[in-house]
């Protein structure tokens, strides 16, 4: 598999790559201090180092922050790395997080204005319910 245009534009620092690899290998969203615990043996000792890397990885679309869980997941949807609209379904029982990829939802959200005319620059929506396994 080749390197995407986004990957060429945003080469990751050593710390960013280490942190991304840990998040990418995880099967569930990870909190910052869980990430810190996992990267300490790789030379990243300070919480600030983790937070800086997380901020950059979110900014370039390599990971997403699940606001309600204050946790991070890797993005496996290359179109997210250029979009400002993200949406997730979160199971209320098992807490499985699934990224919702919908061109029509993204198009609607980027054109949405509220009744006061506020034009939003980015969205992070979270929908809660029961996954197929937990119903």
Q: Would you name each region that the model predicts?
A:
Residues 1-21:
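Short alpha-helical segments that sit at the start of domains
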Residues 18-26, 38, 60:
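Short amphipathic alpha-helical elements of helix-turn-helix/winged-helix folds
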Residues 29-39:
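Short acidic, hydrophobic short linear motifs in intrinsically disordered regions
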Residues 41-45:
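Short, basic interhelical loop/turn and adjoining N-cap
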Residues 48:
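Key DNA-contact positions within bacterial/archaeal DNA-binding proteins
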Residues 51-55:
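Short, hydrophobic-biased segments on the C-terminal half of alpha helices
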Residues 58-66:
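A short, conserved structural fragment
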Residues 65-69, 74-135:
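Non-DNA-binding regulatory cores of transcription-related proteins
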